[in-house]
């Protein structure tokens, strides 16, 4: 089963866009050109019969600009005030863009209690199902104006985690995180020239978490650990997840066409299928790793280069075979 086959069957899709994807880095203002392109992509997915849920960052940034604040809010109260001002303005922009295509949208603001409290969760799920049945595009954000860290239910902490929880809540088939990174590497590519891009993750284990910046890693790629944690939530719930760079918003089209864009984290179901199909190749690569570990008297960089050469000699890009391989 290749990537195109996996993605062709996706019907209920959650797409998260980060602040850096929909704003200008220099000014913090909304990038209306990119946001309009994003909306057109979503409309096209809807026209294909897909159910689409958007998780959108940006409320705090929009509120900060509206309030004339030059710097990011330093206190929780200031952040929540910015979110309260910005959320309505952000939704107004989305609504105006979607209205050009006669597409209805709905604002859905969640707190952690919406997921962890049984009754709240039930109501939230029913709301999403009904909105999708009515052909409405839900636009989701955390209710930052009232979310807290310390009380019984806490908060999501970041929109990657929020998006994963939404995907789990609605039984989504696919979660796409559009962010400021290409995907996942075996090491920080800014520090290690031998870092390899990982196209597909079959299984999330401790070594992969270390690559993402866990306690065992010396080369964490900022923000990647939250994305791996999001992948654990989504894939455990049966959704595949893709991390891709939001600089090119049209990458969403390429993803849905099955092109090798970003890093694909396979759900447990698809992971087992892929595991079986790739077993012979993975066995070969494990032998190469074993020989690599036995190497003595060579620098780490030299050994890594040698391992990569062995990969290429064997005719495979084994970064994509990740899952108890590295």
Predicted regions and their residues:
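C-terminal catalytic "cap/lid" subdomain
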Residues: 1-72, 76-104, 108-326
């Amino acid at each position: 089963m290749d990537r195109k086959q996996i993605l062709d069957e996706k019907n209920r899709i959650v797409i998260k866009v980060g602040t850096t994807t929909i704003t200008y880095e220099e000014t913090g203002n909304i990038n209306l050109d990119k946001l309009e392109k994003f909306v057109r992509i979503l409309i096209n997915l809807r026209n294909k019969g897909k159910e689409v849920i958007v998780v959108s960052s940006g409320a705090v940034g929009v509120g900060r600009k509206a309030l004339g604040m030059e710097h990011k809010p330093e206190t929780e109260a200031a952040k929540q005030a910015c979110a309260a001002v910005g959320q309505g303005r952000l939704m107004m922009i989305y609504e105006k863009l979607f209205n050009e295509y006669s597409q209805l949208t709905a604002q859905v603001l969640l707190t952690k209690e919406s997921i962890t409290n049984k009754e709240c969760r039930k109501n939230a799920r029913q709301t999403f199902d009904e909105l999708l049945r009515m052909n409405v595009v839900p636009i989701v954000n955390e209710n930052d104006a009232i979310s807290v860290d310390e009380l019984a239910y806490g908060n999501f902490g970041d929109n990657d985690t929020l998006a994963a929880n939404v995907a789990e809540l609605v039984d989504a088939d696919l979660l796409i995180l559009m962010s400021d990174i290409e995907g996942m590497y075996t090491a920080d590519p800014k520090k290690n020239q031998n870092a390899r891009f990982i196209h597909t993750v079959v299984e999330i284990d401790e070594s992969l978490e270390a690559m993402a910046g866990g306690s065992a890693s010396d080369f964490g790629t900022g923000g990647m650990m939250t994305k791996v944690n999001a992948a654990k939530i989504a894939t455990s719930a049966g959704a595949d997840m893709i991390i891709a760079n939001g600089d090119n918003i049209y990458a969403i089209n390429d993803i849905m066409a099955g092109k090798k864009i970003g890093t694909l984290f396979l759900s447990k179901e698809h992971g087992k299928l892929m595991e079986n199909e790739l077993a012979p190749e993975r066995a070969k690569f494990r032998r190469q790793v074993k020989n690599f570990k036995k190497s003595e008297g060579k620098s780490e960089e030299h050994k890594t280069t040698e391992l990569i050469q062995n990969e290429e000699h064997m005719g495979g890009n084994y970064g994509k075979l990740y899952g108890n391989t590295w």
